[in-house]
Design a protein with these regions (language model features):
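Short aromatic/hydrophobic "clamp" motif used to bind/position activated sugar donors
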Residues: 90
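Conserved donor NDP-sugar-binding/catalytic core segment of glycosyltransferases
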Residues: 102-146
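Acidic donor-binding segment of Leloir-type glycosyltransferases
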Residues: 22-68
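N-proximal low-complexity "stem/linker" segments adjacent to membrane-targeting elements
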Residues: 1-26, 32
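Short, flexible, basic/aromatic active-site loop/helix in glycosyltransferases
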Residues: 140-171
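Acidic donor-binding loop at a coil-to-helix junction in glycosyltransferase catalytic cores
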Residues: 174-177, 197-206
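Glycine-rich, basic loop-to-helix element that forms the pyrophosphate-binding segment
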Residues: 69-85
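Non-catalytic, C-terminal membrane-associated alpha-helical segments of glycosyltransferases
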Residues: 238-246, 257-317
Length: 317
């Protein structure tokens, strides 16, 4: 049977992390599956907390491992996980999720059912859209007509339709709170300059890299609870600014033509119009700052340029 490495990338969210580990320990390791759990720490977890995790996971048949990073950042935590993990499958979970008891068993069974899969992801409970919300997202290029595809502006709003799925389906992107890959599909992961400070889009980039090794799938049976804890989040202006800027980098790295940038411009304009009635001035300011960079970005690198030559060649086409 395939072996499994679970990675929890965290920073100063002990309550969230403890709740997550509790849910993993209750479910336990899949039968016959060698399972390890890595806590990749950008903060300062107390020693007594770490010792409690080790005892708790040990009773559940899961080997506990810990690494404290020197340089913070979610993408760098992904890179470090790939360096350290020993499992055939690497499962990335946000530290503020809760797993149902059968989650890990269902995940490994899905890999057995889809041996060609480079990655398998799941769904966050409660993510859905109204009919009118779906129409607005389609018209503003925040989602595509297909639940497994990104929009023209490379937005992942299609995931709001994932809850309607009754069976496993192909996708070109994952939700970062709940995604797994064959270790070989993401081996050699490297730092990316534009993902060092803010992580929006890192799940899309990781999915794109893995997809060069094989198809990706979403299994609706892999549904978990995502609390989306607000702690350790950046201010709203920075969040909205980097949300657009990182999508610019995603367009650059896939060598998008003018249509992709035009679509992102329209999506950003829509976001500004949406926030005005709410008087969310910080969000609007962030979007306006990024709006100026969209078309100028097609010629000059922004904060680091492309991925490494190896990965940029893999993603071309």
């Amino acid at each position: 049977m395939l072996s499994l490495s679970i990675a929890l990338c965290t920073r100063n969210r002990i309550d969230d992390l403890t709740r997550c580990i509790n849910s993993i320990a209750i479910g336990g390791a899949p039968e016959g599956c060698e399972t390890e759990l890595w806590v990749i720490d950008d903060g300062e977890l107390p020693k007594h907390v770490l010792e409690r995790y080790e005892r708790q996971l040990g009773r559940a048949g899961i080997t506990y491992r810990y690494h404290r990073k020197e340089q913070p950042g979610l993408w760098l935590s992904r890179v470090k996980t790939v360096e350290l993990a020993q499992g055939d499958i690497i499962l990335f979970l946000d530290d503020d999720v809760e797993l149902p008891n059968n989650y890990l068993t269902e995940l490994m069974s899905t890999y057995e059912a889809y041996p060609q899969a480079a990655g398998i992801g799941g769904i966050a409970e409660g993510m859905s859209n109204s009919f009118m919300g779906t129409i607005r997202c389609l018209l503003s290029f925040q989602q595509s007509w297909s639940k497994g595809r990104l929009s023209l502006s490379r937005q992942s709003g299609s995931m709001y339709n994932w809850h309607k799925a009754k069976r496993t389906f192909k996708t070109e992107f994952f939700h970062g709170c709940n995604m797994s890959f064959r270790r070989e599909a993401i081996r050699g992961l490297e730092p990316v300059p534009w993902l060092q400070s803010y992580s929006v889009g890192e799940d899309l980039l990781l999915s794109r890299i893995a997809m060069k090794s094989g198809p990706l799938y979403i299994n609706p049976a892999l549904t978990l609870l995502h609390h989306e804890s607000p702690s350790s989040r950046d201010n709203m202006e920075q969040v909205t600014y980097m949300r657009v800027m990182n999508h610019i980098h995603l367009l650059r790295d896939e060598r998008s033509g003018p249509i992709g940038y035009a679509a992102l411009y329209w999506t950003t304009l829509y976001q500004i119009l949406r926030e005005k009635p709410r008087k969310n001035h910080a969000a609007i300011q962030g979007y306006k700052r990024a709006l100026k960079a969209i078309f100028s970005s097609q010629e000059e690198p922004l904060g680091g340029g492309r991925l490494s030559e190896r990965h940029s060649k893999k993603m071309a086409g």
